[in-house]
Amino acid sequence: MIKTTLLFFATALCEIIGCFLPWLWLKRNASIWLLLPAGISLALFVWLLTLHPAASGRVYAAYGGVYVCTALIWLRVVDGVKLSLYDWTGALIALCGMLIIVAGWGRA
């Protein structure tokens, strides 16, 4: 389960980077060349999703919990926003949901 969780975090990071770089280009007038690494990051994101052994819908559902946590880490580290109690609580609930889904992969 640790390997799956780490793979989900890597996947989420690729998705966030792949979306953040075009956001920088559009919102902050960053270089259009940021679209190249963004495309690579999003392609890597898609490829990483294929490495999970479960049905795609189950993978996407479980991945969502890790994405929430990764996005909040990004919010704190990159955007410099202090996380609230609601952020922490929501992340914990999302992560618990992911763990429940992943625990049932072999039984479904």
From Swiss-Prot:
Residues 1-5, 52-60, 106-108 are periplasmic. SUPFAM superfamilies: Multidrug resistance efflux transporter EmrE. Residues 27-30, 82-84 are cytoplasmic. InterPro entries: UPF0060. The chain crosses the membrane at residues 6-26, 31-51, 61-81, 85-105. It is a multi-pass membrane protein. It is found in: Cell inner membrane. Keywords: Cell inner membrane, Cell membrane, Membrane, Transmembrane, Transmembrane helix. Pfam families: UPF0060. One of its GO terms (cellular component) is plasma membrane. Belongs to the UPF0060 family. This is UPF0060 membrane protein YnfA. It comes from Escherichia coli O7:K1 (strain IAI39 / ExPEC).
